[in-house]
């Protein structure tokens, strides 16, 4: 086992694509070897991204009343969750959200709306706000607005959006157990359309939703095939009223194995610690940042996060460097 782990970073950095069997073996590594696994994943992060870290921040621009039945989500209208539903917030609030993002040193600001897809009018309103933001504030703008077509993506791109978030969440096999109101294929086609119009892709998963090791490896493999730019890692916080309210939290050790797997399978992708990171990683949060190079700061859609100052302290403590002012990560130190 030790020999297998010690060779992982070298294999990846030499251009080898780890196999499904490798992935399953990584997830089954005994906890006593976890430090060694983290070291290998960290070597890959450092070789590709160096010591740079990016904060991103979001605004919950339209909340609740969602027609979809994602089993983990508080915003679905199918479940009796205590949520304050509201329509798309006005332009002023979208711009103020970007100002707040800049104030906490976020380099990216994501406008997120509930629902299967945004209406044409909503897309136009978002594009109008994005123009003002990109003209006046040093922050990159992303959107997460559900299923979106090529026409709307081109409008958003022209307004200044440079990245779109659309998560596959889990494997194709497990997806139907989590969502029934739309298909995995539909989400996959949206991601491919985003790539077709030349926008950056941010697409990740949520873990702790009843998936198997095979589901996790399959998702990491799909993102490798798609060559996505950013992978947000979310960990379930069971929400009362949703079908997954009784799910057990993942252990920090399990989370670290998943994060390591995604880094080793997707060395060129930004790895972004997002929802549930504080509760699930607990005292291993700094350890996870040895592997990741991005953090969702300032809170999530329906849950508060930890104070942004704590994340900044963590970056300093680890000897890492924040990128701000619309900077991109420096040129990769190695080609993978």
Curated annotation (Swiss-Prot):
<feature type="binding site">
    <location>
        <position position="110"/>
    </location>
    <ligand>
        <name>[2Fe-2S] cluster</name>
    </ligand>
</feature>
<keyword id="KW-0093">Biotin biosynthesis</keyword>
<keyword id="KW-0808">Transferase</keyword>
<dbReference type="Pfam" id="PF04055">
    <property type="entry name" value="Radical_SAM"/>
</dbReference>
<dbReference type="GO" id="GO:0009102">
    <property type="term" value="P:biotin biosynthetic process"/>
</dbReference>
<dbReference type="InterPro" id="IPR006638">
    <property type="entry name" value="Elp3/MiaA/NifB-like_rSAM"/>
</dbReference>
<comment type="subunit">
    <text>Homodimer.</text>
</comment>
<protein>
    <recommendedName>
        <fullName>Biotin synthase</fullName>
        <ecNumber>2.8.1.6</ecNumber>
    </recommendedName>
</protein>
<keyword id="KW-0949">S-adenosyl-L-methionine</keyword>
<keyword id="KW-0408">Iron</keyword>
<feature type="domain" description="Radical SAM core">
    <location>
        <begin position="48"/>
        <end position="277"/>
    </location>
</feature>
<dbReference type="GO" id="GO:0051537">
    <property type="term" value="F:2 iron, 2 sulfur cluster binding"/>
</dbReference>
<dbReference type="InterPro" id="IPR010722">
    <property type="entry name" value="BATS_dom"/>
</dbReference>
<feature type="binding site">
    <location>
        <position position="66"/>
    </location>
    <ligand>
        <name>[4Fe-4S] cluster</name>
    </ligand>
</feature>
<dbReference type="GO" id="GO:0005506">
    <property type="term" value="F:iron ion binding"/>
</dbReference>
<dbReference type="InterPro" id="IPR002684">
    <property type="entry name" value="Biotin_synth/BioAB"/>
</dbReference>
<dbReference type="Pfam" id="PF06968">
    <property type="entry name" value="BATS"/>
</dbReference>
<keyword id="KW-0001">2Fe-2S</keyword>
<dbReference type="InterPro" id="IPR013785">
    <property type="entry name" value="Aldolase_TIM"/>
</dbReference>
<dbReference type="InterPro" id="IPR007197">
    <property type="entry name" value="rSAM"/>
</dbReference>
<feature type="binding site">
    <location>
        <position position="202"/>
    </location>
    <ligand>
        <name>[2Fe-2S] cluster</name>
    </ligand>
</feature>
<comment type="function">
    <text>Catalyzes the conversion of dethiobiotin (DTB) to biotin by the insertion of a sulfur atom into dethiobiotin via a radical-based mechanism.</text>
</comment>
<keyword id="KW-0479">Metal-binding</keyword>
<keyword id="KW-0411">Iron-sulfur</keyword>
<comment type="similarity">
    <text>Belongs to the radical SAM superfamily. Biotin synthase family.</text>
</comment>
<feature type="binding site">
    <location>
        <position position="272"/>
    </location>
    <ligand>
        <name>[2Fe-2S] cluster</name>
    </ligand>
</feature>
<dbReference type="InterPro" id="IPR024177">
    <property type="entry name" value="Biotin_synthase"/>
</dbReference>
<keyword id="KW-0004">4Fe-4S</keyword>
<feature type="binding site">
    <location>
        <position position="73"/>
    </location>
    <ligand>
        <name>[4Fe-4S] cluster</name>
    </ligand>
</feature>
<dbReference type="GO" id="GO:0051539">
    <property type="term" value="F:4 iron, 4 sulfur cluster binding"/>
</dbReference>
<feature type="binding site">
    <location>
        <position position="70"/>
    </location>
    <ligand>
        <name>[4Fe-4S] cluster</name>
    </ligand>
</feature>
<feature type="binding site">
    <location>
        <position position="142"/>
    </location>
    <ligand>
        <name>[2Fe-2S] cluster</name>
    </ligand>
</feature>
<comment type="pathway">
    <text>Cofactor biosynthesis; biotin biosynthesis; biotin from 7,8-diaminononanoate: step 2/2.</text>
</comment>
<dbReference type="GO" id="GO:0004076">
    <property type="term" value="F:biotin synthase activity"/>
</dbReference>
